[in-house]
């Protein structure tokens, strides 16, 4: 099993990444974890926040990153969406041949929510051509790949554990624990994002992931939006195994 980490976009003021992940299994499956942000959505977000802070660029687009690894869109067997915010599902429709995995509670929440964040991305994920497996809670969804529902950042968000032989267990925390500062005991984790929908659930989600780190013997935590630790991770074409 191999885990590739790559950058789909960057938040320029802090150097915080918008990452994507590819897992190549021992039986030659290609599993994508989140599908990134489109240039159009980045422009729309920049308009909303009134600044040109989110930068994408052609080289960072998921299809181009995968192409440099020799992988075409039709070679992606499965996609795990941690959630449906703009930087996690932008290219879902590019992988319509894949099986998609998302928490049932999140899928239903996104469909019914009035949250503008889902209105921005609905065209990417609410497509009858996409085949979703709706997951209920923590479970192994593919050999060596498990999801952990936290509900922190938004209802039904899930983190992903990838079991690697050399590296050990890797936790892709997603936005449930988006930066390393949220691990500290003397901070309020909910202070770190305007997109968090329930501060108390953020705190509960972080506490759950802290327990998971110990109970699942996590050897590496990858934080989604932390420019301070991003340079320390291996990036594609390098990989963890």
Label each region the model flagged:
Residues 57-60, 65-71, 75, 102-149, ...:
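Metallo-beta-lactamase
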Residues 28-30, 165-170:
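Active-site beta-strand-loop-beta-strand hairpin of nuclease catalytic cores
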Residues 38-40, 84-89, 155-157, 178-181, ...:
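Active-site environment of divalent metal-dependent phosphoester hydrolases
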Residues 47-102:
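Active-site metal-binding motif and surrounding structural segment of the metallo-beta-lactamase
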Residues 2-5, 20-25, 137-165:
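Core dinuclear metal-dependent hydrolase active-site scaffold
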Residues 52-62, 167-241:
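Cap/insert and terminal regions of metallo-dependent hydrolase folds
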Residues 32-35, 77-83, 101-103, 149-152, ...:
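Active-site neighborhood of phospho(di)ester-bond hydrolases with catalytic His/Asp-centered motifs
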Residues 1-53, 208, 215-216, 232-241:
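Zn-dependent metallo-beta-lactamase
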């Amino acid at each position: 099993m191999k885990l590739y980490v790559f950058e789909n976009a960057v938040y320029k003021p802090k150097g915080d990444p918008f990452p994507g992940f590819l897992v190549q299994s021992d039986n030659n499956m290609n599993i994508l974890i989140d599908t990134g942000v489109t240039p159009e959505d980045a422009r729309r977000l920049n308009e909303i926040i009134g600044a040109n802070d989110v930068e994408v660029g052609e080289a960072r687009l998921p299809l181009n990153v995968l192409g440099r690894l020799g992988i075409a869109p039709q070679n992606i067997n499965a996609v795990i969406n941690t959630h449906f915010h703009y930087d996690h599902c932008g290219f879902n429709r590019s992988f319509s041949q894949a099986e998609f995995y998302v928490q049932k509670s999140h899928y239903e929440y996104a469909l019914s929510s009035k949250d503008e964040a889902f209105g921005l991305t609905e065209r990417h994920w609410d497509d009858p051509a996409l085949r979703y497996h709706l997951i209920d809670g923590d479970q192994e969804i593919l050999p060596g790949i498990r999801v952990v529902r936290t509900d922190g950042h938004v209802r039904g968000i899930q983190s992903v554990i990838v079991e690697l032989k050399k590296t050990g267990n890797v936790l892709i925390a997603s936005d449930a624990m988006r930066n390393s500062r949220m691990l500290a005991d003397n901070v309020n984790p909910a202070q770190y994002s305007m997109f968090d929908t329930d501060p108390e659930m953020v705190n509960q989600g972080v506490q759950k992931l802290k327990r998971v780190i110990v109970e699942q013997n996590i050897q590496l935590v990858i934080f989604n939006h932390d420019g301070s630790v991003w340079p320390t991770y291996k990036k594609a074409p390098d990989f963890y195994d």
